[in-house]
């Protein structure tokens, strides 16, 4: 069926009548949004059936992308855009008496992720679909998502994010495909005719119910699926206890099961939290691999060719338990011997590492495995024993054996399990992969050098330019055509216009219109009035000390003090925009949010700063906010400690929208610099090797004593701000290190260089032609950071699957 404005109107009206019992005149905006979603869902479901039939008929190798996060954002406009139905859908909504912008705005962000990890997974799913790779994403259907951030008296407060009230319109529950996941109990084993017989008894059952979200590709009928698992108890409420008045006890087992899919990253600084997190991870991978193997057997009748027809890509260490769980199925259910099962597992699982931070390389208490996952624990012990023997035979070095051990000193190391059980291990930027090879996983790389690869991250450029920045998209189509939508390297053609003053003026006007649009958004949603004549200087990302929002705050204090000293100081007006969520248990990150808000309160209420300096913390940073902010941004702050950021993807989105980067040589900034040179970004700070070299002798207290400018800035933390809040704890953390190493992330070491880079940026901003030319150059050279390039690299070097060229 061909869809146009009229057929879409008919379909929407029918959905309203059949699902909500109302006419278009009676429908609410929410009902209208869900009706539109259902219409698009039906179109995608039809395409999905055709895609799966074709994949099965041609016996194509499938990619299974496992990630504890998928930060999908909103899907209505995205799916309409990919299906080439955005214009007719917008017109249909209008003719039914609604404002299309209001309907698109009704959709909540799907609460299935936190930061870059989840957004990357979402971008990759779009790209795999557009490139017509048969792929399924797998995650948990978190009912309350990460959390909704509220700023109260300058501090972060976490509220539940009930996104499914409206967001469930995309989900298709598949009750008939539910899987059973087992926790606890006892395991008995015996040998019968040279076969190991395993009996698991007295376990607790949890049902995993799949809810499927169809994913449309751009300019293709190919549709892939994101499968989200909901946890439910198979047991009904205990009616005997309920009738006796023991209501909570009667529903206890049900509540314990439901908790598994309730919240992303439950706090784990206590035993119960750790237990719930491990349950989440095992629930997710067990349901997933059972589903994959079941479908494989239905098609091929055997698991002996499983590795030839399936690739399991694990996004960070959270899905690592898929390795022992696949082994369990192959040995216990399929009756294979160890060697055959291990061969299959290690020829289909691939691992993407996303961090060099030691605290993020998961280590689980052995005791949790013994009690929660007794059979998996047995398999882990055997994997560990054999791996340890392999390491010993290679190195004959007890220290290296200990470092690479999977089970050691009462802990189970997920990253080492990934290395042992995967066919490929990749980093996500050239610098990050080099650190993995030469430092973090140096010994493993020495054993298996061919296993380690690099695939620099990429972004869904179709979402992050044409969908969110129609002004820029219009300019690009006028100048270079629409080929860049499917071949992002064609953005390079834009560089031919770097000397065209009319084009540069048009680019500047597009940016100004986007600033006005974001200012209207900020006023509506946060009640803040932005100075649109100021530089929009933006740092939005997860709040972590290594990302150094604190360095940015100190630089703002320095700028404010300069204005206080000399009110006639000639500086271009500057608006600093922050957006970040801190993990609920990360006290220091929460204090940095509080500091930024104290600073904002001080500066924004000082008449001296009016129309000159402004600081705004954007509440509840999320994908839909980023979609309005990034086209309006002029300066992109990418200032992590060199060697700590694996890649980053926000830097790529800003670059593609023409913002100029102030940044360190860290993560993908290194590759951006390779493309742009010193002339088109503002670099500063220590390099990764310099950070490690300095660490042995670094004394931030000495910097504090010797540098009067820095000392005055830091003393302001102790004095505090007009809200009466002081930050002695942050001062101590930077200068003296009360509970460990002072200034672990080299904030003070890079402070002077950062202030100088900001000064260079402000100076360049005054030269509008130069600035706009730099902006155009950034856009023109950003095509390499498209997810299509990254996915084609995965397909060629790791997955070995064909794709649409």
Model-assigned labels for residue ranges:
Residues 1-805:
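A conserved ligand/cofactor-binding region detector
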